[in-house]
């Protein structure tokens, strides 16, 4: 079963790492993990797209999306169980993928505190842990 999950009032600060575990639905086109201060202030929009064999990262400020950063290292696959981490540094995010590959994305909005997490699409999150 897939759907949506939102966590509000989270306390993610620079130096924190979010560990995410879950399963990717069979037949899905992709999923989205958002981190920021709300639905219209996303510091990291992380979007593996299976139909395009790419991972798209972006930021959202109000109604304005930034320039997409595309990563062709797609090590996720539908029907699999995965673990990956997102580390928040003051100026960037480091996403460590299940195979150990790491991608970075700048903290374009410059926030020093993230309170919002959402998961959408074909990903069933079984656990998440925020470590400082």
From Swiss-Prot:
Domain of life: Eukaryota
Binding positions for a beta-D-galactoside per the UniProt entry: 65-71
Cellular-component GO terms for this entry: galectin complex
A GO molecular function held by the record: galactoside binding
Residue span(s) of domain Galectin: 4-131
Protein keywords: Lectin
Gene3D superfamilies xref list: 2.60.120.200
GO terms under biological process: cell-cell adhesion; positive regulation of apoptotic process; positive regulation of inflammatory response; T cell homeostasis
Alphabetized InterPro entries for the sequence: ConA-like_dom_sf, Galectin-like, Galectin_CRD
Job description of the protein: This protein binds beta-galactoside. Its physiological function is not yet known.
PANTHER family, alphabetized: GALECTIN (PTHR11346), GALECTIN-2 (PTHR11346:SF104)
Quaternary context: Homodimer.
Protein name: Galectin-2
The organism of origin for this protein: Homo sapiens (Human)
């Amino acid at each position: 079963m897939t759907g949506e999950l939102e966590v509000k009032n989270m306390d993610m600060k620079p130096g924190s790492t979010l560990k995410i575990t879950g399963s990717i639905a069979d037949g899905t086109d992709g999923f989205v993990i958002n981190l920021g201060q709300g639905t219209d202030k996303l510091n990291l929009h992380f979007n593996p797209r299976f139909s395009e064999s790419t991972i798209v990262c972006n930021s959202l400020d109000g109604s304005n999306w930034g320039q997409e950063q595309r990563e062709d290292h797609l090590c996720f696959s539908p029907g699999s169980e995965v673990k990956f981490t997102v580390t928040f540094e003051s100026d960037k995010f480091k996403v460590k993928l299940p195979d150990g590959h790491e991608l970075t994305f700048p903290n374009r909005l410059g926030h020093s505190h993230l309170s919002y997490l959402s998961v959408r699409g074909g990903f069933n999150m079984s656990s998440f842990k925020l470590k400082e």
